[in-house]
């Protein structure tokens, strides 16, 4: 230490009597080891993993476990929970991590990475004029991510979001109106989808793109399909906007088969924290261990109007349900796989409530149907958006006379068929043949068994199994299926199903802009801008 004391005065004298110009002083502040050029291919792949809640920000289970599963799957009554795990959507309780996870991970993960790609491919960036397809694919990913944020929270920072990365030191972005964000996102989808072209140089895009492997035609279909989703989501509050963009989506070309589904592949390696399916990890015994019991609402729907026969059963019953079974880290042990005996757990109940309903001490594992474990392997793919949704939205648009869509019955039947036949990506044994779908459609004729819009809403709801975030949004907008709310003593909503997430406490306390532009009141029953049902 004494040498430092002696050296310091000498250094100070040297600085005082040394002539330095401003440029030399400026250079002293530049870190010669700082990274100022990055391989955008790696960043793009990370952004794609991020939309599957599997990006670079930490636990790949975190957002799925707390929000997709804990809130959404239970609130829309696909799953039920009578103790254990994370399930604020079952009894309408509060979990601060459930509220925070999508906000924090979306901004800090995929949107951060996408912002870097857009910055470096814009004028002045080191890849300016290059990677045009990657740039426009990133705009589509960005629209997907912001749509989800708006649908969860309402108003969010958008136009000035993620600008802390561009050197502007813009650390407290304003909140923007949801309607303005939606309009800009639709414009972005329109421009980005149209601009993608197979004739442009690849420059590593195909290798970086793990969703479509650089297939520009599929990217364009996904962009226009997202446009259709967002336009229909705005249809009750801005008819002109919906009409314009449904028409553009149809003209641009939406998904036409399950081969167009947007799917992020997963893998077992290099570790459980990297590349594995976060939904599966949340449920897998010995890892997440979240209970996997299916809701009575869902099982009753899949068993058809007559529970005493399989004649009108939905062919997805024993695809979504693996049966009544015991699942441990060591083995999946079926107890009862008879379709007639499948039984869902009622939502909003505790163990003592189940005992009272059943008239005996209930062993949950031996009583209630579980999610099929074949859909919950750690390397199972993660489906982001499916073709079935597109056909069902086109059926709704045709039924309501929006955007020039026509032939609602054909679109509905194509949507149901696609929804029944998309699960073989998890395991070949989950394939549903055409005969089974034909029988189901014949037993449930479009617009006859129930009103057409109700049938469309119910099919959208069941088609989003595992993609519970979007099922929650569909239910909030359409109002089908008719769900009976729970009213548990610990609930915070007065017996109302939650209709939005609350902002993270860190955002409330840390961003001064929250006070002037956020959606208020900041509670679970405030409706986002498109929710009129």
Question: Which ranges hold each PLM region?
Answer:
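Bacterial Sec-dependent N-terminal signal peptides
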Residues: 1-29
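Amphipathic alpha-helical surface "interface" segments used
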Residues: 71-72, 137, 204-218, 338-348, ...
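Membrane-proximal, proline-rich intrinsically disordered regions
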Residues: 20-72, 108, 116, 122-125, ...
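Glycan-recognition patch characteristic of GH18 chitinases/ENGases
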Residues: 54-57, 62, 73-79, 83-86, ...
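C-terminal functional modules
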Residues: 420-533
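Structured, solvent-exposed acidic/aromatic patches
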Residues: 34-41, 80-141, 145-423, 427, ...
